[in-house]
Structures are given as C-alpha cells and as structure tokens.
Amino acid sequence: MIFLETGNQFLGTERVSKLMRQYAIPCIISLLVGALYNIVDQIFIANASYLGSYGNAANTVVFPLTVVALAIAVMLGDGCCAFVSMALGRNEVDKAKQSVDNAVVLSVVSSLVLTAVYLIFANTIIAMFGGTVNEETFRHSQEYFFYITLGIPFYMFGQAMNPIIRADGNPKFAMISTLAGAAINIILDPIFIFVFKWGMMGAAVATVIGQVATAFFAVWYLLHMKIIKPASGDYALRGTVCGRMLTLGITSFLSQISLVAAMAAINNMLRKYGALDAVFGQEQYAQIPMAVVGIVMKFFQIVISIVVGMAAGCIPIVGYNMGAEKKLRVRELFTKLLIAEALVGAVALVMAEGFPRQLIAIFGAANESGYYTDFAVKAFRTYLCMMVLACVNKACFIFLQAVGKALTSTLLSMFREVVFGVGFALLLPVFFGLDGVLYSMPVSDILTFIISAIIIVKTYRELNVEGVQKV
C-alpha cells in the first residue's frame, strides 16, 4: 500500500517566486556540486606540473564519455520526476510509485551495460574523442578513463535518483547527498595527486569514491521516501509507465547526448586543424587547443549547471500545477524563469569577456607557454560571446519538457546540439581553420534562439487556454 501525504499540495497554492527559490536553489547547488567532480579534477590536474596541459587534454577527452552516462541517468531521473509530479497533481499515486520502481531498475541495468561497453572498447572510444592528438595525451586518457569507468554504476544511480528525491518533496536531501560526494572528492584530489603522486589515477579514484558516497545516500533515501511509500519491493517493469517516463525524459537525454556528439566533433576538429597550425602543429604544443577548449567548456558547464538547476528545480512545480490545471501559475513561473536565466547569462558573459586571464589562471596557466594563454583568451571571448541566448535556450528546452511537450523540446534540443552544433563545428573550420571551431557555438546559439523565441510566444498563448494533458 502506498499513499499520498498532503505535504505536496502547497505546490499549487504557495507564491511562485518562493517555490522557485525553495526548489531551484537546492537543485542548482546539487548540479554545481555534481559538475565540480570533473572541474575539480581538471583544476588539480592542471596545477600538477607533472601532468599539466597533457592531463588537461586527457580530461577533455574523457569528459564527454561521462556525459553519456549522465545522459542516461537524467533521462530516467528527470522523466520520472516529471511523471511523478504530474501523477501526484492528479492524485494518481499508484502510477507515481510504479515510475520510481521502474527508474531504479533501469538505472542499475543501463549502468552495468555501459560500464561493460566502456571497458571492452576503451582504446577505440578514446580515439573517437580525439585522444590520439599525441602519445602523452593518449596515455593519460587511458589511465583516467579506466578508473572513471569503474565508478559509472554509482555515478549513474546517484544522478538518476537526485531528481526523484526532489519530486518526493525533499530537494535539500538531494543537495546534501551530492554535496557529500563532492566534498569527499575535493578532499581526496590533492592528497592523491600531490601527496601520493598518483596522477590521473588519483584524480579518477577520488571522483569514484565521492560518487559511491552519493549513491549510498540515494539508496538510504529510497528506503525512507516521504510522499510515496512502497510497502513491497515490486520492481517489475511496466511498459506503459516506462514508455511515458522515458518520453518525458528523452529531452534531457538528447540534450546531453547531442552535447557528446558536439564535443566529439569539436575535439576531432581541434586535433585536425590544430595539426595544420604553425604553432599547434608542433608535437609539444599539439594538446593545447584541446586542453584550452576543455577549460572553456568547464566554465560553460558551471553556468549551465545554474541554468539547468533553475529550470529542472521547477519541474515538480510545473508538473503539479499542470496536473491540477493551474496554467496561469505555470505561465507566471515561465516568465520569472526566463528573466532569471537571462540575468545568469549576462553575468557569465561579463566574466568571460572581461576576465578571461583570471579564469585561465585557475587552471594552471602559470605552468604553460604563452601560446596556451593567448589561445585561451581568444577561446573564452569567442566561444562564449552568446551566453545570454544560450541560457534562455536551455531554459526553454527544460520548461517545455516539464509541461509535457516532450517532442517540441526534443526537436529544439536536437537542432541546437546536432544540426547546428555538430554541423557548424564541422563546417566553419573548413573556412576559418582552428578559429572556426570557436565560432561554432555562438552561431548555433543565435540560430537556436530564433526558433526558441517563436516557441516561447506560442507557449505563452497556450498557457492561457484551459485544459491539461494526461499523464
């Protein structure tokens, strides 16, 4: 027997701005802390003189492969979160419970399959993501990838359960579980890298230990859920529930997996056109473009973690109010969300354009050549010049997913990352060389925003019409 407590009814009555703060802030912190796993690794790796830009480049190679795991996890977690929120809004508690059970099973099975694939085809996968730029980068990539792969099941489980915990009405616990894992990683990284001199292995092992801690927090919470209380371990997969849950989460998956495709294209174009450059064509500097773009992406990841945290934190609020047919509240939330996201983008833009050298210094620029710093300044100022539009686009993707417009959200996300992102990453270097890779992101964001603006206007109009989609 499972039952619904009255504690979630405030989602339909409390002030929207207060709900946004209550749900978005813990989600932002959770995502920021989650992002810190890889970012902290890269900071310590970059500042270790015996690793330097080779280690940074290796981190850039492996990073997209962890995003594949994240893509599957957030598809299950965000899809389940949206499903549960809408089901609870309609008081369909049985469906909510089944969705959680199925998400748990799918996260465990998919993580084990992905781990096996990574271990079997490691060298081929590393080469696909540009790891053959030079011998040192390839060697560091192999070492880092192997140990990171061992933590994939724990990483995926923790990430999948995080939005489910938020949907159960406990965003603070979701935040704490992620914080605990990241804190462990931050403490262990300098010990393993600088004291024990374990290099890339040390960075990876510190990350995995933190991920294990987060996964154990998630397991504990599943046994003590607040709103949905399972009485028995019925984890049989149900086609209808899984289908709807995966449909709601497919945008999160495609948003992440298409980013992987874009990063693969970018890494390979950096390798190809870097080899044709007078400076970066030299063996000792070949890894610099990849290392630098990896750093720029880490800054972008921090900003997008805030943006996605705001929007994803609002999924339970949107889902509940859509289920309860309170569309004017959803419209109000959408307005406030877009304004907040644009402000975040504006702050990020000022930082990227005005203080690139200070940002680069965090990632060990003092240990590198002048070529490294010069290219990094150019990369920050060019690659991130349309941050405001990028933030609004991302908010639009997730909001559409939250209101049940999975197809529209998916298509918009795919256009941004695959059609525009991958397309321009492959096309522009043909005309502009290495700089063309840097132009690909702002051009993609401008074109995507044109489509987003049209959809935003249409969505506003629809939120004035009575009626609601069924779960």
Regions found by a protein language model. Name each.
Residues 22-41, 147, 181, 210-214, ...:
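Transmembrane helical elements of multi-pass membrane transporters/channels
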Residues 30, 147-166, 174-182, 203-216, ...:
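Short runs within selected transmembrane alpha-helices of multi-pass transporters and secretion channels
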Residues 27, 31, 43, 82, ...:
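Transmembrane alpha-helix boundary and packing residues in multipass membrane permease domains
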Residues 53-64, 141, 145, 204, ...:
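Small-residue hotspots at the loop-to-helix junctions and early N-terminal turns
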Residues 32, 36-57, 126-135, 191-198, ...:
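Helix-terminus/linker motif at the lipid-water interface of multi-pass membrane proteins
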Residues 56-116, 155-174, 290-350, 354-356, ...:
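Small-residue-rich hydrophobic transmembrane alpha-helices
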Residues 17-36, 40, 65-72, 150, ...:
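Residue-level signal for short hydrophobic patches within transmembrane helices
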Residues 1-24, 84-151, 195-250, 318-386, ...:
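Short alpha-helical transmembrane segments in multi-pass integral membrane proteins
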